[in-house]
Design a protein with these regions (language model features):
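C-terminal alpha-helical interaction appendages
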Residues: 1-73
Length: 73
């Protein structure tokens, strides 16, 4: 990948992360800070960053639900 493509991909991912965090906060009535902690400590985050199974293509709501489910198990 070229640098310009990398920067664009990371900007898109960062926006997606913000939406997922917001979804977690709204769906499960936790503060944004708690939602951020849950998100950034999720085992799913490295998979999203690496593009495993095109997880970044899944809906924000789906990913929020999966991250929450992992956290409560």
């Amino acid at each position: 990948m070229n640098t310009q493509h990398d920067e664009a991909f990371h900007a898109i991912l960062e926006a997606k992360y913000a939406r997922i965090i917001n979804e977690i906060s709204e769906m499960y009535s936790v503060s944004l800070e708690e939602a951020m902690d849950i998100f950034y400590n999720s085992p799913l985050l490295p998979l999203l960053e690496e593009g495993v199974a095109d997880l970044h293509c899944r809906s924000d709501k789906y990913l929020a639900e999966e991250i929450w489910r992992e956290q409560v198990e």
